[in-house]
Structure formats: structure tokens, C-alpha cells
Amino acid sequence: MFPIHKKLLFAFLILFSSFINAQDYSVYGKITDQNGEVLEAVTVIIPILKIGSTTNALGHFNLKDIPKGTWEMEIRLLGFKKIKIKIDKEKNLDLVLESISEALNGVVITGTMKELSRADSPIPIEVYTPKFFRANPTPSLFEGLQNINGVRPQINCNVCNTGDIHINGLEGPYTMVLIDGMPLVSGLSTVYGLNGIPQSLIERVEVVKGPASTLYGSEAVGGLINIITKRAQNSPSFSTDIFGTGWGELNIDLATKFSLGKKIQSLLGVNYFNYQTPIDNNNDNFTDLTLQNRISVFNKWDFQREGYKLFSVAGRYIYEDRWGGEMDWTKEKRGSTEIYGESIYTKRWELFGTYQLPMDEKFIFQFSANGHHQNSYYGDMLYDANQNISFAQLTWFKTLENHELLLGTSYRHTFYDDNTPATADAKNIDLNRPINTSLPGIFFLDEYTLNNQNKLLLGMRYDYNSTHGNIFTPRVNYKWNSIDKQNTLRLSVGNGYRVANIFTEDHAALTGAREVVFINKIKPETSWNGNLNYVKKLFIGDTYLGLDSSAFYTYFNNKIIPDYETDPNKIIYNNLEGFAVSKGVSLNIDLIFPNGLKLLAGVTAMDVYSVENNIRERQLFTEKLTATWNLGYTFKNLGINIDYTGNLYSPMRLPLLSDLDPRTEFSPWWSIQNLQITKRFGNEMEVYFGGKNLLNWTPDKGNPFIIARSEDPFDKNVTFDNNGQALATPDNPYGLTFDPTYVFGPNQGFRMFLGFRYQIL
């Protein structure tokens, strides 16, 4: 017989054992791809229990509170093969997902304003992740886009290195840039606003080539770039990316996250770029690269709400001080005629957010506001401008059988003021008249799934511009895919509409080297566009081959083409009395070998021209053929990656000042090539180094000079005739005036770089 206290202890142990056995358990671990790269935003779920989680930036997940028993767990990520696992107790798992195609990974939101698989989108959208941009590290997103097929960052000035983004041959003002779907980088900020976006906070970049005016308004005529930022919950606790170059450039990216309570998370990022070493390798007494001192601060807040409804607010502030010019220029000479310099001070703030209304129907309210102040001198010419843009949009998503409907309304207000005649009173130039433009609009989208292979997207947008009146932008998209989804065909037709602001879009109008002349009142541009896209996926044994081909055609009326050639002392602006065309074909190839070798390459052939008075003229600064490549190899056992990236451009037509101008009328074939080696130390640290512009190519190759009359930037020693034309003299044998706009590529030659990345979960 057991004593009474032993009986009680025995009973307690039985109850405790039963209690322990009935406890919930957890499953946790890490998920990577076939090359050992961690995968974030992977869904890990037990469907029958409706318990789920997602991986963070380091690929880790933790599924808690799983009831005792045997369950089937699913692991899935768009672009990878789904796997299923039986679980019955606490486990630490290391899982590997097999990629279907790196080119098809992830979700897209740009085409229809809702998240869906890129393969299911009726609109062709290209997606680029941070891994793509890390293959060729750059201090700004503007430079990072250079290895995307059909996208070319164009430098517009040899002195201040301002630039814009060309898509399929169309100039920067035709490209709309969004941050989290908000139109933040536009108007005045298209010149310098793409700098200072912390790349450590970018989740992905979505690119649409061709008009997207139905959803995003009149600026999205040539294409659209949507920068999607990370959410705090998918980011490491701390990360940094620091690199420098042999030219003395230093770029620092810092990011951290923190929480306020259980339902508020914040992501904070800082980007700092500094370059303060004047270099003149082409011996023209002008800086080859603009000196810059820039800081950008980004902060995003995510709020957890009941029913997982969206609520996020973000802001960004940028300050930049940049200058370029004669090598002995100092700030004391800013705005003087003693020494030529271009000095630009930029202050910019942005605020934007998304809020899902607390109701059963899906209503999403989005808002943004930004202010941009640019105080600049181009030689002795002052350009002082302020721009404030506010934007609000309400969208309603509704599903009716096979119809995914989207109804939205938006309002945009733009305030613009500067010290140029653009904001002067028409009758009294001394009277200031800031420009206030209101743009209310409404748009409708119907994504109609005909069957498993056919989908139709119909869209219509109506805007009312307070200056130019009614704007209609319809669009039709059709998508077909084979039963096995290895073949996809997309067709789109629609139109675009754009109101131009010369002084915010064309840097050449500000340099002071030429007089700006308007022949008539500038009318809005209109365009019609067609795009045919075909995607083919092939699996050859363990090798994957993806083909993505497109044909595009855009027809313009009232196109605004700056005339540099009629008078070398003027830029003449007028609407084209004929028409303009941008047409071409492109091909992207994604090749993945099982041994770790990957190739992403593309080529675009295009013809961009205008016709006026039956005279066909090729567009300036536009290549007929461009190619890009990204070749990478991973030594898995060593933790080493090698990336060889580059681009190739065919000759472009360039503006000459006179028949005597000795510079070449067409650029040569030219290429920028880069090599990088990355060594990984665990999942926390990477060290990378390499060389940029391996061929040491610069535009002065084959030219006697790039900047005309760099020795006389204020034209003090130029003799003019009665018509204002420069005369050839012994001191000026070619009859030229100062002009820094003969530019088609970077003046920065070969340089080494070294950097490291570090992150803490």
C-alpha cells in the first residue's frame, strides 16, 4: 500500500503528463532556394487549421500554437514549386524551394492595383528584386536601372550630370515613377528626384513598358516604374550596405525596424552619398563627374488592424548639394561670370499612405503630398523653383462571378512657381503668376476571365485638366495562356495624353547656354499605342529557359520636340505639325543551369522618328539597338558569387552647333561593362568588390572635345553676326558657342569598388 502522499503525487504526475502531451507545439526553420539564397515572404500554412506565417528577410519562419496531432503543412511562393510536409511534433526545418523561373518570381500590383501573380497579369510587367540590383551596386536607383533591357538612364548635361529615364526610346518625361503606387517623382523632381531612394528598403521594382494612363494618369505615356518598399515585418532588425569607389565616392545605406506595442511596426532608413574629389581626365578644365553631398531619410509605419486591413504611412526627406563646372570653381563664385559652375541645392519632402476602410466591401484610400524646392545657378543664370503636389485616390474592388471590377476616383493638385517667364503674367512679365493645376479623375477597370486560358481587361479613365479640359484614356488588354501555362500571349491597345512643362522637364532650357524660344502656345501631346507580348517557358532537363518577346508601336500627335539645330544659340519649342513614331521589338532571355550558372540578357531594336512637311527625321539621343546582360555564377561550397553585367548601345544622332563643328554627328558603338565578386559569411555578412566600366570607355573617345568652347563658357570671346550667329575667327575656328548638351554617356571611366553588407535578424 502506498502512503496517501505518494498516491497524491502519482495522480499529479499522471495529470501533468496528460497536460504536457496535450500541449500545442511549434514548427520553425529556414527556407532557401536551390542556390542557398534565403527566401522572404514565403507562405507557410496548415490549411485545415488556418494557421499560417511568412518568412522574414533572412528566410526564417515560426509556426506557433499547433494543436497536438498530425497535420499537412504547405510551403508556397509564387514562381516556386509548392511543397507539402507532414508534421506531428516540434521541428526545426531547413527547406529548399525549387524555382520555376527567377523571371516570374513574386507578385505584381502595378497592372491592376491589386496583388496577383506576374504570370496571371493581363498586362506585361517586369519585376526586379534587390538581388538583381546588387549584381552591380550603384549609389542611386537612377544608375541601377542601366541593366534593364529597353530602359536607359540618359545623362542630359556634361556639367551637372542631371538625367532622366528613357523607356523604349521615349524621353524621361514620358516615364512615370511611383513609390508604393503613389505618383511622387514627377514634374520638377524628374530631373534630380530619383536620387536618394535607400535601396536597402526596396522590396522590388516593377516596370511597365508602354502606356499605363488608364490607371495612373496622363504622365504614364511611355512607361511606368513602380518602386515597392519593404514592410517592417519582412525586414531584418538592422541592415547596412556601405561601399566606396576609387574615385572617392562613398555610399552608405542604413536600415532598422522597431515596434510600438504589438500592432505598430516602423521601418527607418537612411541613405548618404558623398563625392568631393574633382577629376578632369578629359582635360577640358571641367569636372568629369558632378560633386555631390546628399542625405535621404525614409520612415514607414505599418499598423496591424482587425481583419488584416491595410494601413501604412511613409515619408521621405532629401537634401542635396551638387555642383559641376570649371575645376577652380568655388561657392564664392556661385552665380558670377568669373568662373563657370552649375550649383544646385535641392530640398524635397514626401508623405504618402494607404488606408483600407473598415467595411465589408474592399475600399482603399491612398494619399500623397510632396514639396520640392530647387535653388540653382547655371553659370550666372538663376533658376529658383517650388513645386507642391497633393494627391488622393479612393478605389473599390468588387468581384462579380468572372469579373474583377475596379472603380476609382482621384484628385491631383499641382502648384508650381519659378523665376522664369513660365510663371510670369502674359501681359506684364514683372508680375508673377504661379501655376495651379487641378486634375480630378475617375477610372474603371474590368478584368474578365473568359475561361482558364483567356482573360480580357477593359479600362477607361476620364480626367478634367483645369487648363486643357477633358481627357479620355481608354485601354484594352487581352491575355491568352496555354493549358500548361508554358506559353502566354498578351495584346494591349490604348492611348495617352501628356501636358508638358518645359522648364521642369528639359534641363537644356536652364543651362543659360541657349535662349529658350516658344513659337506658339504649347498644346498637350496625344498618343496611341499597341503592344504585343509573348512569353515562353522551356524546361530542358534540369535547365530552365525563359523567353519574353515584345513588339511595340506608339503614334504621337502634337509631340513636343526641342529644336537644337535651327539656331545654335536657341532651343526652339513647338508642337510638331506632323506626327512622331516610336516602334520596335525586344527580347529577354532568362537561362538557369543546375550548376549555378545564370544568364539574364536582353536586346531591343527600335526606330524613333518624326515626320513634318514630309521630312522624316530621327530623334536625337536615341539608339537603334541596345543590349543588356547579367551573367552570374555561384560557387556554392565557397559562398562566392561572380556577376558580370553590361550594356551595349548603337550610334545615336547628336546635336551639332554648326557645319564646322568637328564633333561626330553620331556616337560610336559603346559599352559599359562591370565585374563583381561577392563573398558571403553566413547569412549575416557579405563582402563584395570589383571594377566598373572595365573598358574605360568615355564619350571623348574619337572626339576633339565634348563641351563646346569650354575655355570660354560665357562666350566673352565669341563674335556674332547681325543674325546672332557665331562667326569663325582665329580664336574660334569652328564658329561655336559654349554648349554642354552634347552628351550621350557618362564621363566616368574605369574605377574599382569595395563594399560590405551586414544584417541582424
Feature-to-residue mapping (PLM):
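Gram-negative outer-membrane beta-barrel transporters
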Residues: T449-Q453, L547, A551-Y555, N575-L656
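C-terminal beta-signal and adjacent terminal beta-strands/loops
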Residues: L599, L648-L656, K679-L761
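Short acidic/polar hinge/loop motifs at secondary-structure boundaries
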Residues: N62-D65, H166, M182-K209, V297, ...
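Membrane-embedded beta-barrel scaffold of Gram-negative outer-membrane proteins
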Residues: I364-S376, N481-I483, R490, K523-L576, ...
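Extracytoplasmic beta-strand/coil segments of soluble accessory domains associated
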Residues: F142-P183, E203
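N-terminal periplasmic accessory domains that precede
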Residues: N92-V96, L141-G144, N161-H166, L178, ...
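Short, acidic, small-residue-rich periplasmic hinge/interaction motif at the N-terminus
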Residues: T32-Q34, V42-P47, E74-F80, E90-R134, ...
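Flexible loop and strand-edge segments within Gram-negative outer membrane beta-barrel domains
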Residues: Y275-S296, D302-F363, A369-I389
